[in-house]
């Protein structure tokens, strides 16, 4: 019997990106560079191509581990969508992107802390609670503008809306986020209904940083500050029925995941 090696081939592609990334950061972060360099050097496959064992480094900046997290999060989020729809017939899913102004690397850590506090104020508002939402999934993403060299942290959120529930319009969400963030200069939030399709699930299955944002080398002197800013930051936060779905389905926190496949269930 021949092995299905498609997963191994995809890991190999990401491994090349990881080696390039490790070379770049070696002068400023040799320990992290070493972990990423040796990540995924030993991978065990089942006959049907599932990754049964591997020495993944699990670092947030490792291209291989980023890819594995995204693959697993996509499947888990799809299963959560299906579980929630079965438990709450007629519910809707609303996708919201909450942005803040770009900041230089020196201000990123404080901006992330401010965003966490703003989110707490946002969800504690009396008018927000009156919406009667069933739960949500909030994901943090941080991108880098290659032209300005600034960083753009933002939240992707999927809200689960009960059947027949009225939701306010775009201007209400923008105003509430401005007040929660205590920043009147915020001029944009993105609000739309999603259906659990592949494209909508992919949007909330990203991980905190993308290796494509680090194709050049201008960011290298900033890496230690970036790494420190994202340390101990909660990037994946389910609540309500979404947390219940993950618990019922036996999913673990993405940062604690081994990044191998669950060979007992075939995925």
Predicted regions and their residues:
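Right-hand nucleic-acid polymerase module
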Residues: 1-151, 161-267
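Cys/His-coordinated zinc-finger cores
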Residues: 157
């Amino acid at each position: 019997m021949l092995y299905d090696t498609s997963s191994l081939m995809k890991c190999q592609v990401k491994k090349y990106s990881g080696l390039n990334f490790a070379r770049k950061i070696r002068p400023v972060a040799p320990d992290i560079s070493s972990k990423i360099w040796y990540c995924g050097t030993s991978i065990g496959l089942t006959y049907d191509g599932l990754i049964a064992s591997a020495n993944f480094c699990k670092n947030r900046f490792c291209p291989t581990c980023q890819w594995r997290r995204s693959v697993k999060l996509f499947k888990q989020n799809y299963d959560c969508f299906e579980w929630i729809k079965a438990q709450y017939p007629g519910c809707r899913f609303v996708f919201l992107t909450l942005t803040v102004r770009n900041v230089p690397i020196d201000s990123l850590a404080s901006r992330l802390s401010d965003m966490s506090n703003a989110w707490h104020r946002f969800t504690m508002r009396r008018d927000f609670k009156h919406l009667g939402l069933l739960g949500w999934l909030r994901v943090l993403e941080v991108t880098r503008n290659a032209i300005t060299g600034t960083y753009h942290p933002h939240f992707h959120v999927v809200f689960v809306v009960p059947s027949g529930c009225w939701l306010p319009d775009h201007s209400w969400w923008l105003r509430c986020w401005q007040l929660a963030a205590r920043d009147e200069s915020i001029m944009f939030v993105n609000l739309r209904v999603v259906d659990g399709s592949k494209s909508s699930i992919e949007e909330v299955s990203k991980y905190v940083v993308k290796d494509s944002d680090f194709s050049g080398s201008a960011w290298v002197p900033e890496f230690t500050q970036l790494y420190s800013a994202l340390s101990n930051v909660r990037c994946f936060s389910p609540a309500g029925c979404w947390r219940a779905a993950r618990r019922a389905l036996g999913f673990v926190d993405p940062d604690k995941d081994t990044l191998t496949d669950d060979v007992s269930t075939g995925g």
